């Protein structure tokens, strides 16, 4: 999941180089990206993959000033981790499908600036094409306004053993929030995945008074 940090660095460096070359308004286009870093593996259907993809979506939102488009590769089947798995006339959504559904269903209108302060971790081994990383935040986030002017915050927790407690502060003076709708996707283990008879990794919503 920490590989998102590498991809965000590549995007920022690429756009900076292109814009310095004489086109300050140049935008990047992500023509295709996959739902995980290990291709042709059951892991593409797990909660682990959903955490990775939530991080990718947050990264894309934070960088909308640099991106003209972002396309996901193959929504249905196509490889073991297709977002929608179809077989013998039946279909179910992977954990990543439900994450994408949450984001797309939020009906976003505007991306807000956000600063996320979180403990970090480092990796010591190369995984696929991702070399060891340092300073990867456990908590990742993005903030937006929806069509009704409501603030929408997307937050993910990369820690496998620690819950994340979020403290949200607005820069707007006298900004108050009376209640919040919280929608979560989680499971006991990052290796958990949906199956045709048991699609249990789905969004769960509740209201909270502040």
Task: Enumerate the language-model features and the residues they cover.
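Short, well-ordered amphipathic alpha-helices
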Residues: 10-18, 56-57, 165-170, 182
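Glycoside hydrolase catalytic-domain groove-lining segments
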Residues: 1-41
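Aromatic/acidic polysaccharide-binding cleft in carbohydrate-active enzymes
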Residues: 29-140
């Amino acid at each position: 999941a920490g590989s998102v940090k590498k991809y965000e660095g590549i995007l920022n460096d690429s756009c900076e180089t292109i814009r310095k070359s004489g086109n300050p308004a140049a935008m990047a286009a992500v023509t295709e990206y996959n739902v995980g870093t290990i291709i042709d593996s059951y892991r593409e259907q797990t909660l682990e993959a959903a955490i990775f993809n939530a991080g990718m979506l947050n990264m894309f939102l934070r960088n909308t000033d640099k991106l003209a488009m972002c396309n996901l590769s193959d929504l249905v089947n196509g490889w073991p981790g297709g977002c929608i798995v179809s077989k013998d006339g039946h279909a179910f959504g992977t954990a990543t499908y439900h994450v994408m559904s949450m984001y797309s269903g939020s009906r976003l209108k505007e991306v807000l600036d956000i600063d996320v302060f979180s403990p970090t971790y480092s990796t010591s081994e190369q995984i696929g094409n991702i070399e060891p990383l340092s300073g990867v935040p456990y908590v990742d986030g993005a903030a937006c306004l929806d069509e009704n002017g409501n603030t929408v915050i997307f937050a993910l927790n990369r820690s496998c053993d620690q819950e994340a407690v979020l403290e949200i502060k607005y820069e707007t003076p006298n900004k108050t929030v009376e209640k919040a709708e919280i929608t979560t996707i989680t499971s006991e283990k990052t290796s958990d995945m949906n199956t045709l008879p048991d699609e249990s990794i789905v969004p769960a919503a509740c209201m909270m008074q502040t």
